[in-house]
Amino acid sequence: MDVVRTAIGLMSGTSMDGIDVALIRTDGRGFIERGPFLGMPYDAEFRGRLKRALELARPLRDRNERPGELREIEQELTLRHATAVTAFLERFGLAANGVDVLGFHGQTVLHRPDEGLTIQIGDGRELARRTGLSVVYDMRANDMVHGGQGAPLVPAYHAALAGKFQQAGEAVCFVNIGGISNLTYIGADGRIAAFDSGPGNTLIDQWVEMQTGRTYDPGGEIGGRGKVVPALAQRYLDSPFFRGNVRRSLDRGDFAPLRPDEASLEDGARTLAHVAAASIVKSAGFLPERPSAYIVCGGGRLNGTLMAEFSAMAEGSRVLSAEAAGFDGDAMEAEAWAYLAVRSLDGLPLTFPGTTGVAAPVSGGVLATP
C-alpha cells in the first residue's frame, strides 16, 4: 500500500509577489487531499531585492555560485520562508510534527535551458534547520542533467487532478498564468504534453509599475479602459518562440518590456493582456488536440481583461477559472510543490518527455533533514 504523507509546498514565482504556502495529504500518485492555503506577500523593499538578484545572477555560469550580495538575498529569502512556515502552522493550528516534508521551490533568478543552466536561490539545508522539518528542494536540476528543459514541473500534479475529466472522456488543458504562462494538456487517454506558452503577468506588471508605481493591474481594470495597439502586439507575437515545433521553457527576461513612451497607460495594459491571451492560444496550437476545457490558475485568472480576451480566442473550448472547476487557483502551484516533494521521497518521476523534453521520466530533488 502506498504511504500517504502530509506535505507543505512553498512557492515564490516569477511574479515575485510573495510566498504561497499550501498543505496536502498525498501518496504522490492519485490520492490527494487538499488542505489550507496561505499567501504571504513580499514588501516593496524585498521585491526590489529580488529584482536585484536577477541582475546579480545574469553573469553566473555555475549554478552553485552565490557571490556576495546574492548570498545575502538568498539568506533573507530562506528566513522569510521559514517564517512563512511558522506563520502557516500557527494560523491553522497545526503541529510541526504532523508534517512529513516541505517542498521548497526557492526563487528562480536565472533559467537558460539552452545552456543547461537553472538557478533557484534558497538554502534548503538552512530551511530544514530553522523549521525542524525535512525539506526537498532543487527539483529542476536533475531534469536538466538528463537533457530536459527544467520546466515545467507542475504538470505531474495537474495530471493527478485531471481524473474527473478523463473519466468523462475529455481532454483538458491547465493554463497557469503567472509571470510566465504555461500549459498542461492531459488527454482522455492520460497522455501529457506541457510547455511554457509565453508571457503571462510579467509584461503587464512591469508596465503598470513603470507607469504608476503599482505592482499589477488589479482585476484588469486599467487594461479594460484601453485598446489594443496592433503594431505593439504583433511585435511580441512575431517572436521566434512561437515558430517551429520544438517547445522550450522561458525566462522572464525573454520578452522585453514596453518602453515608457510607446503607449498610454491603459492602451499598454490592454495590449499586453491581449498578448498574454494570444500567446496561450498560439502555443495551444502545438497541443495534440484542442482541449474541451481550459482550466486557468495563477494570478492572471483574476485579470478580467486578460480572461475576456482569452475566452474570445478559445475557439469553442470552455475557459474556466480554477475555482469554477473545483480547485484553488491561488494554491495550485504551492500544492504542486508539496506533491512533487512526496514523489521525490518515493523516487517517482517529476518530469517526462512530454513535459520538459527529457529523454526518459526522471525523479529529482535534494533531501535536507534537520
UniProtKB/Swiss-Prot annotation:
Gene Ontology process terms (BP): 1,6-anhydro-N-acetyl-beta-muramic acid catabolic process; amino sugar metabolic process; peptidoglycan turnover
Keywords: ATP-binding, Carbohydrate metabolism, Kinase, Nucleotide-binding, Transferase
Pathway: Amino-sugar metabolism; 1,6-anhydro-N-acetylmuramate degradation; Cell wall biogenesis; peptidoglycan recycling
GO molecular function, one term: ATP binding
One Pfam family linked to the record: AnmK
EC number: 2.7.1.170
InterPro entries per UniProt: Anhydro_N_Ac-Mur_kinase, ATPase_NBD
Uppermost EC category: transferase
Catalytic function, reaction form: 1,6-anhydro-N-acetyl-beta-muramate + ATP + H2O = N-acetyl-D-muramate 6-phosphate + ADP + H(+)
Binding site for ATP: 13-20
Sequence similarity: Belongs to the anhydro-N-acetylmuramic acid kinase family.
Function description: Catalyzes the specific phosphorylation of 1,6-anhydro-N-acetylmuramic acid (anhMurNAc) with the simultaneous cleavage of the 1,6-anhydro ring, generating MurNAc-6-P. Is required for the utilization of anhMurNAc either imported from the medium or derived from its own cell wall murein, and thus plays a role in cell wall recycling.
HAMAP family per UniProt: AnhMurNAc_kinase
Record-given protein name: Anhydro-N-acetylmuramic acid kinase
